[in-house]
Amino acid sequence: MEIEFIQNLEKFCIGLQSNKSNERETSEQSILTLMKTPQPYKLCFNLLSKSNLTIAHFYGLLMIRDSAIREWAALDSQTKIMIIETLFQYIENMNSMNFLNYATKGQSFNTLGVIIKRSWLDNEKYEIGKGQMELNQIVMDRVYQYIDSGSPDRIEISIKIIGSLIIEFSSSSKAAHIQLSWEFHQKCLITFQNLHLQPIFRKVLELLQQFKDHIQQVPSRLTDQSFLQILYTSVKVFTDILDWRFLESGSSVLAYITSFSGGRTNLKPTIEWISLFTPSQSGGGISPIVSLVFGLYQLVEKVEKIPNLLRHAMSQLCGLQGPIIKDQKIKNQYLSEVLTFTNKLIEKSITTRNWNEMEDISNIIYKFCNTYKFSGIACLPNQIVIPFLQYTTQFVLSSLNLMKIWAKHGEEELEEEFENDCFDILLRSFVSLISDAEMLINRKRVDQLENFKEQYQVLKQCTSQIYQNYIQSRLELSEIEINKSNEELEPTCKSRGGIGGAEDEIDEDKKKYDEQLRSVAYIGRLNPGQSLELLKNEINRVINSLKERVSDPILFESLHWLLIFAGHLIFDAENKTPSAIPNAIEDYTFEQCKLTPASQVDGVIDLCNAVFRFHMEYENPLLNNGKMDTISPLVSQTSLWFTSGWSLVYLLPSSVFNVQISPKIIEAYGTEQPLLSITDYFINKILLNLKCWSGDLDVLKATSNLLNSFTLNKELCKYLIRSPNWSRLFFLEGISLLPPSVYGQLFKAFSRVVFSFPLSTRREYFIQLVKTLVEQMDGVLGRADFTKISQEAKIKENIYILLEKLNGIVSVSESEYVDDEDDCLFLTVDLFTKYATSLIAMIPLYDHCNDIVLLILRLFSNFTKHQLEYLNQDRARSIFPLIIQLFNSVATTSSHKKTLDSKEYYHRVRMMVKILTNIITFGDQRNNCPTIISETIFHAINIITPCLSNNDLLLYPKLARNYFMITSFLFGADNIQVKNIPVINTIYSLIEAGILHHDLEIVKSCFECIGCLTKSLENSKEKSGGLVDPHYQSVLIQFIGSVINFLLLQDFNVDELLSVASETLFSLMYSSPDGYRSKVIELITRQDPSIQSRVVQQFETLTIIGTDRKSKDLFMKNLQNFLVNVKSLINKK
């Protein structure tokens, strides 16, 4: 039988390497069958002693491992010790087996490591010498003997065994799944950590110290490949131990589980490790680990692979936390030593061109700065901290130079990768230091730090260098890009700054460098005066040069970036509504106002004036002379983006947002006469842009966005309408046809202005706003032959424009401009209602024109989002039936349109779901029309559910989340009988599928649906005197099974989903205890008989003792423990 087993396995292994797919598949299935052989240990060890086929050895070792995992509890003591002893012998003899490859050798250590862990908690005693020992003691004694043997071969074996044990006992992502409880894994980790991790680490540390001494004495050892291999293996084990997630002895199982959530964590050894990490007086005040890592690195930094591991170790040492450095004196000593070594490392790396090295050092710097921040280093001597700041600054500047070198040599991908992986991290390092330093200043803790003043001053000097060099480097990089483009493109479209530039480039630049720009702006604000002056001078220089060298693409590109830098410096670019002045800028301008003469212009005002010179001195004169081809659309967009952001922060600045506004800023941007001049100028600017940039949609969008930014400030609207040119803009006098989307944005802004008028005149101005619109709508829709002429190009163009204008008007909520419901005139509601039916009737006519259909849907979406707040019952009765008409029209038209693109169909359905989401979330606080709303949702969900389920649209997470939110609302409605929903069975199926979705929010939404359903059932039971509808009873039992299966058979995010899953299971068990018991029995009967009693005992801990919050919290706690004890036992097949 043994010979036949060897022959068969070898034959199947050879078959795996066949060129014929059917032979490979047959061989794979045959090996899988062999792998299920009960207790194959003697067969496998016989194969390992006789076969010369490396792949056969690989699968033999794998079979030993998997069988031992599966059968360990049933094996007798002699078999267990035989397996481990024979594996040790096999590993010792591997060097004589020249045919073994790297993977097979690695599998031998993996097999031994996994079996050692599986046997770790065994209690059997074995006769060893004169005493008795447990199996784990026997194993570890053997490992210690190997590492102390002095034999290079045995030392290497011990290191590799230790490496395998670290992987398995740390439960890393590479660890084998041995199908035991979390409690078992936790006990293994803590006992291994407490008994062996530190002794092993000390021996590895001692071994590495010996290697270091050998290298110093005999440098030629670095050319010995055998020596380098064992050195690499030892350093790898060393770094793996530094990655260990330490647990205190009394830690709960839940603490063990949650320690693996998230990414890589900081090094946090227990207090017992203090002598290894902190400086000792006997060792000359030097930490053994720190001195070894940095000292060994200096010797091997030219060797392959090993330096990378040591730099990772440095990163871990630069993030050391926990009880061993809790004492401030010890912490300061440790940080001083680490920083001393790190300074030498950074200084030496300033001139490096090694990408991997720079990435690692960037991470080391970031780890140190982000962990200890400025408060950590401010306690250290200046002679250590100041060089660190200066060397790190030089490293950043060197990185900028390296990026330029790569860009010049055509290695743009390498430059971009470096920016993403290294440079952003370096900038965030300084952001961490600055934010912490500012916090110390704000909390008045500076006096407690002896060296804060000097170090903070150096930090300011360093960040000033970084900001200035970053600005210059970004301009140089853009120039390099332009020059390369000029070599490839025709003269008419040489730069993206010219007419031939790509669309949306300003957004592309801001998104691509978003993280960088925010970090750089934060750094620049530490020296606001210098940063403002730098940008002002650069912008003035470029504009002066532009006036001399009109249309110069490099100047356009430079100005584009300078405007972006200016915007990020003086306001937060993500602002979409009126916002505060950034604190650093506000404080600086306020203080400067007190220190400088009244005649001296504020730095922010100076910078803004420089930016506005582009409009006034360059762009506007050329536009007035019809020379659009000499202006960069990109720079025009960027200048408008800057002006929009500036207006939200500085124009009529709010004392609500800002504590101390500079009087000079108030005088320039917050008093009547300047405001009238500013608003009049920009109204003229908007008119000029609308007139002259009619061929560039992006500039027109940026122009209309500027007007919207102005109108977001209700107080500023009063100044807009006082402009002599307001009526020209309001009635678009002298403006030729604009793109439809621009009309939408303009009418949105006009509506805000109209609603800012007093109630007495609001209706009059609203009528003026919509007069032309109404005439055109009536003129088009009122024609008897509209159906006949509807497909004419001119008619369709008019329809686009009218729908965009309506969307703009409907997007402004009248309720924001009134204090009370009684003051609402419902001007927009009445306008919408007048044309809603006609617009719905247009959908079949324009079914082939998806843009028009989507515009109509967007109109209804905007209406339901912005116009429902004060809706009374009478108006609701006339409006909500229109929603059902709309849905029926879209669903009927779309369903039979076979040529409709799936993307177009998705967008239509998405808009319908959005409309329903708006309806259920607008918040009917006055309870004006709850019945009408729930009835609308009832009818609408029957229309959209087939649209979703028949087209797999629930694969789209956002769409699915909103759909289940709507379903929860419907399930919770008092006047709706869930079982009467025609598509209810489809909804149930979708909920069950949603529970297994990869998106956390979808899973939560599905649990909430089930929760709402159980509440609905409880309400119906109360109304019916305790009677349970059979429909609901069967559905609840079905969902009980689904929730139990989710908890036990699915891997899920405990932090995010356990609470809502517990709440759902609690309500299901309370509503249907018999159904819960039936599902538990069904699950248990599917399990192996050997574990059934254990599972039953655990299920008995899940009981409900009450329905209050305390009882639910206790239930969730019991559920946590239940999952810890049961989940790993359950058969998932």
UniProtKB/Swiss-Prot annotation:
Its main location: cytoplasm. SUPFAM superfamilies: ARM repeat. GO terms for molecular function: nuclear export signal receptor activity. One of its GO terms (cellular component) is nuclear pore. It is found in: Cytoplasm; Nucleus. It comes from the Eukaryota. Keywords: Cytoplasm, Nucleus, Protein transport, Transport. One of its GO terms (biological process) is protein export from nucleus. Interacts with Ran and cargo proteins in a GTP-dependent manner. Belongs to the exportin family. Mediates the nuclear export of proteins (cargos). In the nucleus binds cooperatively to its cargo and to the GTPase Ran in its active GTP-bound form. Docking of this trimeric complex to the nuclear pore complex (NPC) is mediated through binding to nucleoporins. Upon transit of a nuclear export complex into the cytoplasm, disassembling of the complex and hydrolysis of Ran-GTP to Ran-GDP cause release of the cargo from the export receptor. Xpo4 then return to the nuclear compartment and mediate another round of transport. This is Exportin-4.
